[in-house]
């Protein structure tokens, strides 16, 4: 996909290549070479900005990033889809943009206006936070109550009952 088209689709929200801090655009051979030994988690939420329907902009880009890293022989890349839907506003948000962040950082109760703060949400937050913490420690995303997470092309679906596809 041409980079200017990608930039337009993402509303200009791409990393700015400055040649120093960000030396190359993600998924270019140069960027992949720099980070080839670093395991990565990449994923999206189910609805992003489209309540009631599956995301069609961010998800394909995340899958492509995982595919590119895998094809380049990089360290493992772990793909996820966050499908848990917020009950807030009678469920109108679904699994909206950035909803996984309170779960990854185990801040579900702190952000109950976004998450609803229910028991299932709190438990999922505990599990997801352990997954990310273990990944930071070992390079392997794992936690009790979460299926063994295999690298791409597998996909971890986080929900009340998480599953590996």
Give each language-model segment a name.
Residues 1-10, 27-165:
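C-terminal helix-and-tail extensions that cap enzymatic domains
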Residues 13:
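Active-site-adjacent substrate-binding region
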Residues 16-31:
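A Trp-anchored, charged/polar loop motif used as the substrate-binding/catalytic surface
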């Amino acid at each position: 996909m041409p980079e200017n088209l990608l930039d337009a689709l993402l509303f200009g929200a791409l990393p700015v290549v400055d040649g120093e801090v960000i030396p190359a655009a993600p998924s270019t051979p140069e960027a992949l070479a720099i980070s080839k030994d670093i395991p990565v988690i990449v994923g999206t939420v189910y609805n992003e900005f489209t309540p009631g329907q599956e995301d069609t902009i961010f998800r394909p880009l995340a899958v492509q990033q995982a595919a590119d890293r895998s094809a380049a022989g990089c360290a493992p890349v772990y793909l996820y889809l966050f499908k848990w839907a917020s009950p807030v506003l009678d469920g109108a948000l679904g699994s909206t943009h950035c909803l996984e962040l309170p779960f990854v950082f185990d801040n579900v109760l702190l952000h109950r206006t976004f998450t609803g703060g229910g028991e299932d949400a709190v438990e999922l937050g505990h599990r997801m936070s352990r997954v990310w913490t273990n990944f930071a420690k070992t390079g392997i995303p794992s936690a009790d109550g979460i299926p063994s997470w295999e690298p791409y092309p597998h996909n971890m679906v986080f929900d009340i009952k998480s599953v590996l596809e």
